[in-house]
Amino acid sequence: FIEKETGGVGAMGDIGSYSLDLLLNAVGYPKPLTVTGYTSNFLGKQKEFYSKSHPEYAEKFGVADFAAGFVRLEGGIVLDFRISWAMHMDTLGDALILGTKGGLKIPSTECWNGYFSQPMTVYKMVAGKQISYELPVPKSDNFFEKKITSFVDAVKDGGKPTVPSSQALINQAIIDGIVKSAAVGKEPTIEVPEV
């Protein structure tokens, strides 16, 4: 998992895909135009980071434990995206969607599991005043199970999956763009195959 040959790209390709999917869904899944990326494996290469558990991992560590991307999307949307497995911080912070008619604060969460532990907050102008209100968090213990069941049902019955393949391609094109940009030090061409 931590070796380049078998682990791929690290945190961006692992937990980054879930956070990126959440943000792209919130803005309508536009196609990427350009991506500038940065990756680092600094903490993963430090023996002291592992305490006494597995210091030998530092020598094997070959994937990024931190990645950041600045993504320009269709429709004039810009995404400032960061993800990390390891950092000297408790969180990289809340996700902020800043629109022309309002904003949305999405609390830092382990969004891979399909739910939020805290409510999201909407900010907007009403009658000339800035207001904010929380969106209630739906109570459910089985969001992840629902995702898996939906996928299995689509495969068994030949139906449409809840996540279109076009979204998976956009998500992966952005991740690939961030990793390539970090490797070459400039913006690569982003190509999203048509489905």
Explain the meaning of each model-derived region.
Residues F1-K60, G185:
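Predominantly a Rossmann-like dinucleotide-binding segment in NAD(P)-dependent oxidoreductases
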Residues I15-Y18, K146, S166, I170:
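A generic structural signal for residues located within well-ordered alpha-helices
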Residues S19-L20, E145-T149, I175-D176:
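A general structural signal for well-ordered alpha-helical segments in protein cores
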Residues L20, A64-A67, Q172:
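Conserved glycosyltransferase catalytic-site signature
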Residues N25-P30, G103-L104, I178-S181:
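Phosphate/oxyanion-binding loops and surfaces in catalytic or ligand/nucleic-acid-binding neighborhoods
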Residues T36-Y38, R82, E191:
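Solvent-exposed beta-strand sheet faces enriched in polar/charged residues
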Residues Q46, Y57-A67, R72-K147, P164:
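NAD(P)-dinucleotide binding in Rossmann-like oxidoreductases
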Residues E74, M120, A127-G128, P136, ...:
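C-terminal helix-rich "cap/oligomerization" subdomain common to oxidoreductases
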